[in-house]
């Protein structure tokens, strides 16, 4: 059976007038309008001409746009809401703050950083600030919070984007985030059902199943979703994640070949989520360009299958003409039932009614705050102060086994060498970060202001790339043939700080060491020069440098984070962060420090 929505019940709680609007709106739709209302558009322009044209052509229900300046986003959303026939859901990815809605918004911190403050108040503040800044420019939905469990340190997608590894903490912080953002008129779509963070692959690029048994899943992810549903969670994003062992227990007659990811799987969405867990809200697919979805079925089939399986909104067109045609064909040939089509429309329109969008007919411009008033809510001193507090409280001293290494003062360590440690450099991340101030430059400035002499090491590969092409082969050969005195390091530096800046962007989230031998590129010198490692992105860098005795997770390289880091290194501030994940990565050697006093 298909579980149909009850708009009078949680999370909608609609009155008769609102339900009448939902039903009358559906009754007055053409088939093309009904099909259009299944889609979430990703716009390629903010111009009025483009926005009005695509709304007329494709009649979509919702938008998820790329962030821009608040002034531009306000204009975009004003056009969308005043020119659309039916009010639009306008979503952003406010996972870490208002910066997910507008580029001049406030980043409070990724979820793992918020969790490291060890204070649920900051999860609420994250939601609240994100809600204030997003709603100011006309957003009314967000694809957050992330409720995955960080149980595999090799996972490249949610390493710093999830609250942590423990069920209770994820529940507590997700509820607080939801409370903060819903207070400000934003519908949260929690993700990624049925649960990421167990497999080490990226469902943007590959299948990435969750291998849990049903009892394991019910005690972990199932419990998280049950608690959030009970708390009134209005939206869920279905990930392109298989749940094969759970599905096999529910349907022993099925083979693995019969099983699809959750975004295309009626058993997982209708029987499990809506049936056993009692979810009555709306479901959006994760992005439909991801290989976890596109490699599962021909696109002509996966479009109607996603809706028939229980999704109410389909995230992003590929080619809009093609996608709309195929969704309509799927309805006409029975792949998408009339019952499921109309249930999806009720759930989506129900969210719009829950937000009160139906009450603005004839005065749509009043949905938006006046522009000047809206822009005054972006990047306020209050929001920046919350971000500063999180930066101060979150930084975590994970490993501190070198006796008396801290504090870092000019009297103890006059000459400091900063060594940048990086990962995959390709992809869009490299293009986006071009020209941005590096964490090492910011750290250098702050340390020099305190009286240190600071150098930044140019890694061996980068140096060789600058040589004339004909000289490079000999230089590379020399890397492996040459040896150099340790005194080249010990005579010149009193302290070395390895700054690990490795973020997602490839199939793996690991340090990629440059070709080098005897240079500071890799921290072989931990017993030659006092050495500190600081990760300014993902919290699992210790796996690739277990030999170090002092390791710190800063979680990001925001200016206030680097400033707080320097205060803590110097002893002016205490380390108070508490890791919500296993920074030792379940490995034995990451906890070891070979003291120089051994064997004496």
Residue ranges and their predicted role:
Residues 2-10, 14-100, 147-161:
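Short, well-ordered alpha-helical
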Residues 1-57, 265-266, 275, 295-600:
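Preference for extracellular/luminal or secreted protein segments
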Residues 41-47, 92-100, 140-150, 190-196, ...:
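Short glycine-enriched loops at secondary-structure junctions
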Residues 35-43, 61-65, 88-96, 141-145, ...:
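Hydrophobic faces of well-ordered beta-strands that scaffold small-molecule active sites
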Residues 37-47, 111-125, 206-220, 289-297:
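Active-site mouth loops of central-metabolism enzymes
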Residues 70-87, 120-136, 341, 346, ...:
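Active-site-adjacent structural elements in enzyme catalytic domains
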Residues 30, 72-86, 98-100, 165-340, ...:
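Second-shell residues forming the walls of enzyme active-site clefts
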Residues 51-66, 125-142:
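Catalytic domains of carbohydrate-active enzymes, especially glycoside hydrolases
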């Amino acid at each position: 059976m298909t579980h149909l929505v009850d708009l009078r019940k949680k999370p909608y709680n609609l009155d008769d007038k609102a339900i009448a609007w939902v039903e009358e709106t559906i009754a007055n739709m053409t088939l093309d309008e009904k099909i259009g209302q299944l889609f979430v558009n990703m716009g390629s322009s903010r111009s009025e001409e483009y926005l009005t044209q695509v709304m007329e052509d494709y009649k979509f229900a919702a938008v998820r746009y790329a962030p821009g300046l608040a002034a531009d986003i306000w204009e975009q959303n004003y056009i969308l809401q005043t020119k659309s026939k039916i009010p639009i859901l306008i979503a952003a990815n406010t996972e870490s703050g208002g910066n997910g809605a507008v580029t001049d918004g406030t980043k409070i911190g990724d979820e793992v950083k918020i969790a490291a403050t060890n204070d649920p108040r900051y999860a609420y503040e994250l939601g609240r600030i994100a809600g204030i800044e997003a709603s100011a420019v006309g957003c009314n939905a967000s694809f957050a919070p992330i409720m995955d469990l960080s149980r595999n340190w090799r996972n490249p997608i949610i390493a710093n984007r999830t609250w942590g590894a423990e069920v209770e903490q994820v529940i507590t912080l997700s509820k607080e985030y939801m409370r903060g953002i819903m207070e400000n008129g934003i519908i949260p779509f929690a993700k990624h059902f049925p649960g990421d963070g167990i497999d080490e692959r990226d469902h943007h690029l590959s299948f990435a199943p969750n291998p849990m048994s049903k009892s394991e899943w019910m005690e972990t992810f199932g419990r998280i979703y049950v608690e959030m549903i009970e708390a009134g969670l209005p939206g869920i994003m279905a990930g392109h994640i298989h749940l094969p062992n759970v599905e096999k227990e529910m349907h022993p007659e099925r083979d693995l070949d019969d099983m699809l990811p959750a975004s295309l799987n009626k058993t997982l969405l209708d029987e499990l989520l809506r049936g056993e867990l009692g979810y009555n809200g709306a479901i959006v697919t994760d992005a439909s360009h991801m290989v976890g979805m596109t490699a599962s079925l021909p696109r002509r089939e996966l479009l109607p299958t996603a809706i028939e399986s229980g999704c109410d909104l389909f995230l992003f067109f590929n080619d809009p003409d093609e996608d709309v045609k195929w969704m309509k064909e799927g309805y006409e040939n029975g792949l998408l039932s009339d019952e499921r089509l109309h249930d999806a429309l009720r759930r989506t329109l129900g969210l719009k009614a829950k937000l009160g969008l139906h009450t603005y007919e004839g005065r749509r411009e009043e949905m938006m705050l006046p522009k000047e008033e809206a822009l005054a809510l972006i990047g306020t001193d209050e929001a920046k102060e919350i971000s500063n507090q999180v930066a101060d409280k979150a930084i975590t001293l994970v490993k501190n086994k070198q006796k008396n290494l801290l504090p870092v003062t000019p009297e103890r360590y006059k000459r400091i060498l900063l060594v940048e440690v990086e990962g995959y450099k390709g992809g869009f991340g490299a293009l986006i970060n071009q020209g941005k101030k590096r964490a090492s430059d910011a750290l250098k400035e702050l340390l020099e202001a305190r009286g240190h002499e600071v150098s930044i090491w140019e890694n061996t590969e980068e140096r060789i790339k600058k040589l004339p092409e004909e000289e490079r082969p000999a230089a590379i050969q020399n890397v492996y043939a040459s040896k150099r005195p340790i005194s080249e390091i010990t005579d010149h530096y009193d302290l070395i700080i390895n700054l690990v800046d490795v973020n997602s962007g490839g199939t793996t989230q690991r340090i990629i060491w440059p070709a080098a031998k005897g240079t500071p590129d890799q921290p072989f010198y931990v017993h030659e020069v006092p050495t500190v490692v600081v990760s300014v992105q993902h919290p699992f860098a210790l796996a690739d440098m277990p030999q170090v005795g002092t390791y710190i997770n800063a979680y990001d390289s925001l200016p206030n984070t680097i400033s707080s880091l320097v205060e803590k290194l110097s002893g002016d501030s205490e380390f108070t962060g508490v890791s919500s994940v296993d920074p030792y990565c379940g490995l034995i050697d990451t906890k070891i420090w070979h003291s120089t006093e051994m064997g004496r």
